[in-house]
Amino acid sequence: MNKADYKGVWVFAEQRDGELQKVSLELLGKGKEMAEKLGVELTAVLLGHNTEKMSKDLLSHGADKVLAADNELLAHFSTDGYAKVICDLVNERKPEILFIGATFIGRDLGPRIAARLSTGLTADCTSLDIDVENRDLLATRPAFGGNLIATIVCSDHRPQMATVRPGVFEKLPVNDANVSDDKIEKVAIKLTASDIRTKVSKVVKLAKDIADIGEAKVLVAGGRGVGSKENFEKLEELASLLGGTIAASRAAIEKEWVDKDLQVGQTGKTVRPTLYIACGISGAIQHLAGMQDSDYIIAINKDVEAPIMKVADLAIVGDVNKVVPELIAQVKAANN
């Protein structure tokens, strides 16, 4: 393999039912930065059916070019179909970097593409950078159970691949001036129904009455220090008064105090709210990786040496079950 043959940064643009996923737009933001450092184009790779509007949305969010594989066989995700089409495109066009969202689709698709292309894949990255001189992707992720932060380099293989969870990076502002039909290339694909060994027989959407913590502007998060499921009710009251929602650390999830969809951290969700109130959370590295980019962090903990206190903009030393009721009273008084 000649590394010099590989040029360009690609983002797999994940769509479900004709709707682009947020993480793909976030990856365009980071991908644009990577592409500019390398002096190459940022290309969004879109697979689906009736892709015209989505293609324009990708351009308005930073893509220099869109490769659109538009076919009825690609309307819904299939491991075989998507992997084949993307691998064919990579072998033909030779990008040096390929980013994929770490969604349930991306976690299925990414390793299969990497295996077929005999290249490396760094999963669940929390940071991405470029060694411009060597054109190497520097992919950073927690390792050894979150006790270390490792930067992984795939220097001898191309394309370099990484998956990133939703919320790690920010979308670029919408720029409709970047939208142009000549930036959208509809690519021919070699795919037949027989290439797809698995079929989707039915899609059942589960309705959950739980807020998406990844979209919340205010989060009140509880950890082991909250003490009980009942004490979480006070956190819910505070969150409601502030127009936010509750979240939790892994310790609180494991004790089944709240739903697992509310977990923040390396094994949960990455969030970046305007306000993050950490209640009784010590701040293990896995948790910090999921919330440290919040605009303003308030930490409430009895232990002044807890790691969360060092990253907080405001650290309150005290019993969370005494401090939170006082905060509730103060907010109610201010609202009146």
Curated annotation (Swiss-Prot):
Pfam families: ETF, ETF_alpha
Binding site for FAD: 275-303
Segments traversing the membrane: none
Keyword Nucleus (UniProt): no
InterPro entries membership: DHS-like_NAD/FAD-binding_dom, ETF_a/b_N, ETF_a/FixB, ETF_alpha_N, ETF_asu_C, ETF_asu_C_CS, Rossmann-like_a/b/a_fold
This protein's UniProt keywords: Electron transport, FAD, Flavoprotein, Transport
Record GO biological process: fatty acid beta-oxidation using acyl-CoA dehydrogenase
Necessary cofactors: FAD
Cofactor: how bound: Binds 1 FAD per dimer.
Molecular function in Gene Ontology: electron transfer activity; flavin adenine dinucleotide binding
PANTHER family xrefs: ELECTRON TRANSFER FLAVOPROTEIN ALPHA, ELECTRON TRANSFER FLAVOPROTEIN SUBUNIT ALPHA, MITOCHONDRIAL
Family: Belongs to the ETF alpha-subunit/FixB family.
Function description: The electron transfer flavoprotein serves as a specific electron acceptor for other dehydrogenases. It transfers the electrons to the main respiratory chain via ETF-ubiquinone oxidoreductase (ETF dehydrogenase).
Assembly mode: Heterodimer of an alpha and a beta subunit.
Protein name per the record: Electron transfer flavoprotein subunit alpha
Gene that this sequence comes from: etfA
